[in-house]
UniProtKB/Swiss-Prot annotation:
Disulfide bonds: none
Keyword hit for Ligase: no
Pathway: Amino-acid biosynthesis; L-leucine biosynthesis; L-leucine from 3-methyl-2-oxobutanoate: step 3/4
Name of the molecule in the record: 3-isopropylmalate dehydrogenase
Organism from which the protein derives: Buchnera aphidicola subsp. Uroleucon ambrosiae
Effect after changing residue 255 to I: In strain: GA2181
Sequence similarity: Belongs to the isocitrate and isopropylmalate dehydrogenases family. LeuB type 1 subfamily.
Function comment: Catalyzes the oxidation of 3-carboxy-2-hydroxy-4-methylpentanoate (3-isopropylmalate) to 3-carboxy-4-methyl-2-oxopentanoate. The product decarboxylates to 4-methyl-2 oxopentanoate.
């Protein structure tokens, strides 16, 4: 491990600063209790940066991220900045440029339904079953139809308007995301399901062929393929059959949100975006939730689990990441809840949940 591991913390807007305060409790425990050599610096991002520095992604923030080993991100955006041009708003002008600047091509979205929270899932109880489910959706983030050229809108001579986008994938883009999926499968349950539409799309034919070739390097991992339409049905029908879902940009955008909603609370779900050097941006899967900003009722678990993902994938310290995850599970088993996951009015405030998880991590109970 490095003698110093530098983390740029970007709290952002809405509930971002509130849940980030709870993540700091975990970071301080990692420094002081587990003796991890963390160097933590905080920078402005999003609407907060617009208000204070005039732009959503200040040069100082970008430079700080360049000089770090990982980014811990909160959330950005809110109605306050909706009057700005779209490309100047916090969401478009901060997070997307960060992803592009650091070439964060792989998005990891765990979707876990804890057995203690199965009542939250919209799925029938016999589908969610007593042990819940744990899926990791791996989405290619920098290729595909969102970035393909040409794209645009036009008008034909007979006044018929039309629009077009281009789905394009290069084999190296598929190759690197596939290798990552198989490598992560070797740390989990040795199963990868690749999702495509190769019965219709040429880009999906290349996707399936490339993933199949890469799989030969990982004979211990079982590979299966599903068309996107069937995959979305199978996830609802029996999520337990899946471990890792490997998806293109468009399909991953759809599938990762589907996996998230069947857990019942997006406030529980972290995410990571990685580049080829395993530099990563770690953030909750949810948004800035301005409607509950300042009420001290936001769920900090997704932000805390984002720290766990940073430790697992950025620092490669699986055992310590497991301890953070286990602390969350232990707290849930004891019946502690925040407002979004409580089935009654007896719930903890944001800071109280952070304290309980932090104390559990220290005690190991």
């Amino acid at each position: 491990m490095k003698t110093k591991y530098r983390i740029s913390v970007l709290p952002g807007d809405g509930i971002g600063p509130e849940v980030m305060r709870e993540a700091y409790k975990i970071l301080n425990i990692l420094k002081n209790h587990f003796s991890l050599p963390l160097e933590i610096k905080e920078f402005n991002i999003g609407g907060a940066a617009i208000d204070q520095e005039g732009v959503a992604l200040p040069k100082k923030t970008l430079l700080g991220c360049e000089n770090s080993d990982a980014i811990l991100f909160g959330s950005v955006g809110g109605k306050k900045w909706d009057h700005l041009p779209i490309d100047k708003r916090p969401e478009r002008a901060s997070l997307l440029p960060l992803r592009k600047h650091f070439n964060l091509f792989a998005n990891l979205r765990p979707a876990q339904l804890y057995s203690e929270l199965k009542y939250l899932s919209p799925l029938r109880s016999d589908i969610x079953i007593k042990n819940g489910f744990n899926i990791l959706c791996i989405r290619e983030l920098t290729g595909g139809i969102y970035f393909g050229k040409p794209t645009g809108r036009x008008l034909k001579k007979n006044n018929i308007e039309y629009a077009f986008d281009t789905e394009i994938y290069y084999d190296y883009e598929i190759n690197r995301i596939a290798h990552l999926a198989f490598q992560l499968a070797q740390t989990r349950n040795y199963k990868v399901c690749s999702i495509d539409k190769s019965n219709v799309l040429n880009s999906s034919v290349l996707w399936r062929e490339t993933v199949q070739k890469v799989s030969k390097n990982y004979p211990d991992v079982h590979l299966s393929h599903l068309y996107i339409d069937n995959a979305t049905m199978q996830i609802i029908k029996d999520p337990n059959q899946f471990d890792i879902l490997l998806c293109s940009n468009l399909f991953g955008d759809i599938v990762s949100d589907e996996c998230a909603i069947i857990t019942g609370s997006i406030g529980m779900l972290p995410s990571a975006s990685l580049n080829e050097k395993k530099f990563g941006l770690y953030e909750p899967a949810g948004g800035s939730a301005p409607d509950i900003e300042g009420k001290n009722i936001a769920n900090p678990i997704a932000q805390i689990l984002s720290v766990s993902m940073l430790v697992r994938y950025g620092m490669n310290l699986k055992k310590i990441a497991d301890k953070i995850d286990q602390s969350v599970i232990s707290v849930l088993k004891k019946g502690y809840r925040t407002a979004d996951i409580s089935n009654n009015n007896n719930y903890l405030k944001t800071n109280e949940m952070g304290d309980v998880i932090a104390n559990t991590l220290i005690s190991g109970e």
